Amino acid sequence: MHATRPTLYGTRHAVSAGHYLAAAAGFAVLEAGGNAIDAGCAMGIALGVTLPDFVNVAGVAPILIRKADGTVETIAGLGHWPRSIPADLFMREHGGRIPNGVLRTVVPAAPDAWITALERHGTMSFGEVAGAAIRYARDGFAVYGILADNIREREADYARYPGSAPIFLPGGRRPEVGETFVQADLARTLQHM
């Protein structure tokens, strides 16, 4: 049986991510002398920028690290709901669904997970590994088909929130495939971190 994609070979490093710019960020970190943890964190942060409809920098980032001796370390990277939220609230009041809005929000855990991984096993600082993600957010990247489709499907939701509308509906309209998608506030936040 033949694979639908070609087998790729290399002699120095290999990375894989859900967006080619995130993979480029990880590869650049490895080329600069970083290790796999540095590259993984760089890719995770970049995915929060390049896949904003799937991944969120202020979301979750569970991390599994397999060490050279074969042991595995986990960094939970999972956010929590406030203690005041009853465990059965979503079943009782929302039919088992988590509604849009503040009830969907957990305490952001991804930044802590990345920083913890870098402190324990990395060779680079958060600022060094976040450089590409900051650049992608600040300067933008080309809108791709899935992002354009997801923005179209969620247009009404984005329009409801004054913090989301200028990002996902710049100038009051959906960005088209190939247009530049900029997240200046996210770039400033990552730069501050």
List the model feature ranges, each with a label:
Residues 1-24, 28, 36-193:
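Noncatalytic scaffold domains of N-terminal-nucleophile
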